[in-house]
Amino acid sequence: MNSKTLIRVILVLIVIAIGFFLIRRKIAPKKMEKEAVFLGVEGYGDLTKGEKLDHSLISKFKFNFYIDGEQKTLSINNGKEVKEGVYTFELQNQLQEGYVYDIVIDNDTVESVKLLDNDSKTMISGKVNDIEQDKFVQVGEEKIELTKNTGICKITWKAGNSSVEKVGIDDLKDKTVKVTLDKDGKAKNIYLTFISEKYISPVIPIPGEKTLKNFLTTALQPVGTTLYIYGGSWDWQDEGSSLQATTIGIPQSWIDFYQYQNADYTYREKDGNEETKNPSSSYYPYGEWNQYCYAGADCSGYVGWVIYNTLNKESGKDGYVMGATKMAKTFAENGWGTWTQDVKIPTNRDESDFKVGDIFSMNGHVWISFGTCDDGSIVIAHSTPSDSINGQPGGGIQISAIGPSEDCEAYQLAKMYMEKYYPDWCKRYKVVLKKPEDYIKFKKDSAAGKFSWNLENGILTDPDDYTNKKPAEILKDIFQEK
């Protein structure tokens, strides 16, 4: 082969290579950034508990989004594999049904997500005060110009998958909306959707202040505004703490979900009737993974959140959510205090085994003690299922009592403070009274038992002398009553 022929061959090969590259580039999908409403898991409820449940199947889930006016089903990057079939699931842990995100899609797989609710440059939320067809929508005091491409739709939250439907501009009158903005500050999309009212807790804890008083104040912060979700504040994959459990302050998603619901909310089946169970439309995690981990807190999720907020000033560090049964013993093993199974039902305050700030792990439940009253009853805080006034099993974070009857001092204190400071909650739920024989018990051959803080050489101190105060004195002080 002479040199001219060789050059021709090389040139032909170069042209073929360039052509192949251009064709491949044209065919191969590009990364796309899209605005999307997260709707939920495709086939939610299909994977349920059982002897043959393969938990690793959650890594193969597909997810529904509302994008560009239609529902689309996509995969989501699972993150790093930490053990066979179990990944870090960073993106799944960030997604909340019915919320609006900017997402990046690569080859039909979501690679990143960003919640838009917290970005005032890209979203304006509030009540529609004025509208004019094809011209503007006024949200609060903000007048936002419409374009011919402005989308208008309605988001509906519901267990099993949220939904989105197109609506007209007249449907927006006097309703709450989220308006996303284009690069010129004009309305890109208008979502008619639920927006919670601003909530201010009646108690004021100090994140990271390691005192017994602040621990108990922190425990009261989410009372009356957080619903019970089984697996709530565990992470999505049911391995440890959710993002909410390591959030400083009450997570906004807890507040949103509580205000969205009413006395008909049930964390499981309607009327508590298991014969009517339908995993595809229930908030209960029948598949041992927690789609609604962001919406509320179960007992251990709540205590984990309280511990985190007492010991930390910033969000996002390692959390403390674990099985309720082993919480008390684990905290003792951390060097924070002592653990014992040597407890009995108290008959008076002086001889009670239950002190201020104790954490009691039952088999399958955990609660925080605010101390023993003179009559031996105990004021507690916990997240627990309780029936609503409509007979629906809901409940959540609340002040309750352990005692023989509603005449006991602890119940009277719980009732007084719940009704005074959490009236909206009390429109849905009655104050809970638990019998001592039901709430002060455990299996001897388990990790269950009572944890007490070492206030001399442990992680918490007691400069306010809460150890020697009665529950009535403690509640009065925390709520800053004269």
Which ranges hold each PLM region?
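...with weaker cross-activation on analogous glycine-rich loops/strands in unrelated enzymes
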Residues: 313-395
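Solvent-exposed hydroxyl-ligand-binding patches built from regularly spaced Ser/Thr
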Residues: 33-104, 111-196
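Sec-dependent signal peptide cleavage junction
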Residues: 20-33
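N-terminal capping segments
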Residues: 198-312, 445-482
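N-terminal Sec-pathway targeting helices
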Residues: 1-13, 22-23
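Low-complexity, Gly/Ser/Thr/Pro-rich intrinsically disordered linker/tail segments
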Residues: 396-482
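Glycine-rich catalytic cores of cysteine/serine-nucleophile enzymes that process amide/ester linkages
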Residues: 224-252, 284-288, 361-424
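Extracellular cell-wall/glycan-interacting regions and their flexible linkers
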Residues: 10-20, 87-90, 98, 157-160, ...
